[in-house]
């Protein structure tokens, strides 16, 4: 018995949509990484050092973004199951009107 009106199918659909968007973002980051590696050959001297420093910052930021995407996707995946279990446990303690 559920006491609250949660749209569990919507949570599952949101997780699927988020996974697709996260995959697209990871792909875009990967493409940017490849483009940067190709562009690195055109830099020389101080320009090369500056480019490498900027590229290192980009790689670090991309790693953080990927970690956050993983966390968000895992949280969405657990949300429906956790909600259903907690709601069912709380519903059994409800005595009625």
Swiss-Prot record:
It is found in: Secreted. Disulfide bonds: none annotated. Its main location: secreted. Keywords: Acetylation, Secreted, Virulence. It holds the Pfam family WXG100. Transmembrane segments: none annotated. The modification N-acetylserine is found at residue 2. InterPro entries: ESAT-6-like_sf (IPR036689), T7SS_ESAT-6-like (IPR010310). Coiled coil: none annotated. SUPFAM superfamilies: EsxAB dimer-like (SSF140453). GO terms for cellular component: cytosol; extracellular region; phagocytic vesicle lumen. Belongs to the WXG100 family. CFP-10 subfamily. EsxG, in complex with EsxH, disrupts ESCRT function and impairs host phagosome maturation, thereby promoting intracellular bacterial growth. The complex acts by interacting, via EsxH, with the host hepatocyte growth factor-regulated tyrosine kinase substrate (HGS/HRS), a component of the ESCRT machinery. EsxG stabilizes EsxH in the host cytosol. To improve expression in E.coli the proteins were cloned as a single protein in the order esxH-esxG with a cleavable thrombin tag. Forms a tight 1:1 complex with EsxH. This is ESAT-6-like protein EsxG. It comes from Mycobacterium tuberculosis (strain ATCC 25618 / H37Rv).
């Amino acid at each position: 018995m559920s006491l609250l009106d949660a749209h569990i199918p919507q949570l599952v659909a949101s997780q699927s949509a988020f996974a697709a968007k996260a995959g697209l973002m990871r792909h875009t980051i990967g493409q940017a990484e490849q483009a940067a590696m190709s562009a690195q050959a055109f830099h020389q001297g101080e320009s090369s050092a500056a480019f490498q420093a900027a590229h290192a910052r980009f790689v670090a930021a991309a790693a953080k973004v990927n970690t956050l995407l993983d966390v968000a996707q895992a949280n969405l995946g657990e949300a429906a199951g956790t909600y259903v279990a907690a709601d069912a446990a709380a519903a059994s303690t409800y005595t009625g009107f």
